[in-house]
Amino acid sequence: MKINELRTPCYVIDEGKLTENLLILNGVMRRTGARILLAQKAFSAFYEYPLIGRYLSGTTASGLFEARLAHEEMGKENHVFCPAFLPQEMDELVEICDHIVFNSVSQYLLHRDKIEKADKKISVGLRINPECSTQEGHEIYDPCAPGSRLGITREALDKAIKNGLDLSRIDGFHFHTLCEQDSDALETTLAAVEEKFGDLLYGLKWLNMGGGHHITRADYDIERLEKCIMHMRDKYDLEIYLEPGEAVALDAGYLETTVLDIVENNGIKILILDTSAACHMPDVLEMPYRPPLMDSGEPGEKKYTYRLSSCTCLAGDVIGDYSFDREIKTGDRLCFCDMAIYSMVKNNTFNGMPLPDIAVMDENKDCKVIRRFEYEDFKCRLS
């Protein structure tokens, strides 16, 4: 089956591009000795976990459910971080995770006994806040913004040490401060980490540099990244971890959709699609951003310009304005690009919108549907 034969709406995972990304990441691992983990919050299509596991060291989770998924479907290194863990969650996490990272000293102290009494050795980390913002235009995703709840500042850590925290029981530090950024932002962040926490790094076993590294983007400076990794590895004798999410499946997915109707208002021709920004690609409204669309241009660039929208009742459920060389008609199919990341993991059934099917496309461009969602999937989430 080819992509234009799939029922719409449908997410399509491009296994050829996914493999290209994994080869790039695996190359960084081989050259630097770093361990790279899939951040499941961006991409949790576990059908592909056997493929991903052939190239990466494992996964990182944002809570119990993701950690369970990784344990069941990949079975490699299993890391977890959450701003706060429930006591009953920790009972299971100590059985299935290798690394557990805490957001605060109080969380570590609350769960310390369960970790130390676990049947296996759990590597314990603390998330630090280097108080170094490098983002522009993504404030909602900036963990170093003033008043952030994420990570421990040096001031807070010093206070905890003064009050009796035994750092010798902590194996590593974790920071996650980037979002879709190049390695120059990592270099800047590492300078802040060394300035604020460098004296404490010598006593640790590992440093996790988090995610937000757009390593597989065409213009990403991999050489600088590798220098950063080796600098921290060699200076402090640390094992280095990276946990990208987007970089694993960047440009490795599509969202195939059909034009249901065309309406006009104030001279604007509006395409009503069987997909939705609010339901199927929430980051379009949350960031916001205009997703790439195959065979299209900027508004006015090509002969025919349309506004792309949805069949939900939300007035603001608008994807963006695009232009085309040809006139679009009801029944035509359109294809959004870069739809593997932060799509399937964030979609919802607001307004009773059906969830898109999920398909995989092999290197011969042949597609196979691996999941279909029907009415019962909508109903089972309600009561």
Locations of the language-model features?
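Glycine-rich beta-strand-to-loop/alpha-helix junction loops that act as flexible
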Residues: A39, T177-L178, L207-T216, P244-E246
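Active-site-proximal beta-alpha core segment in soluble small-molecule metabolic enzymes
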Residues: A34-W206, C228-H231
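Short acidic, glycine/serine/threonine-rich loops at helix termini
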Residues: E92, D113-K114, T134-I140, A185, ...
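N-terminal capping/small domains of soluble enzymes
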Residues: M1-G75, F81-A84, E89, S276, ...
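Charged helix-capping and loop-helix junction motifs
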Residues: E187-A192, D221-K227, T257, S323
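Feature marks short, surface-exposed loop/turn motifs that line or immediately flank catalytic pockets
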Residues: C132-T134, C179, I215, V248, ...
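Charged (often Lys/Glu-rich) extended helix/loop segments that serve as interaction or gating elements
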Residues: C228, E239-S383
